[in-house]
């Protein structure tokens, strides 16, 4: 399928064969930003407008990002209030995460990134200090897991049920991503070059999975 994103770095390695400071195993794809095609049909099949159902439970504003998962045919909207709304592929409202915000054992206090998790069939919510809350699409807690990063983390994607990739804010590290195994609690760091912007990158999507490959776009 054609896609409409620019891929800058390809991550094609697993966590099991990495050194503590990994410098290889990453394929870097240079992009010529000065020679961009004006023919959008080369990478876009179609553009569709999907009206989202509006009711007392689905009203939202100031969203950070909108995600679509083709496998489940579900949209997720992540707002600046760190509330997530889910909708079916035709725009029907499913649920929101307001009822799960709080300090309870099944609740999340802070979620700075959200990602579909195909392995647990839910949504991963990331706390910057290393807690991952995985909820079903109607926001029932499926899993709550922890990792202890050296610094706060701000983006995530699951390799499988146990292995994840995270990014560190540029305030804390010099352009590094972290490969983590939640079962063994091992974390391996990899350097990259090519930060696109500075400042707050929380609203920017960094990780993509297309086929069997994982892609990383520096924030």
Question: Where are each of the predicted segments found?
Answer:
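Short coil/turn segments at the loop-to-beta-strand junctions that recur within blades
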Residues: 56, 98-106, 147-153, 192-198
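Short beta-strand elements that form the blades of beta-propeller/WD-repeat-like
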Residues: 30-32, 73-79, 121-127, 162-172, ...
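Repeated scaffold domains used in trafficking and secretory/extracellular systems
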Residues: 62-65, 108-115, 150-159, 199-206
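Beta-strand-rich domains and repeat architectures in extracellular enzymes and scaffolds
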Residues: 48-81
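Short loop/turn segments that connect beta-strands within beta-propeller blades
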Residues: 88-90, 136-140, 181-185
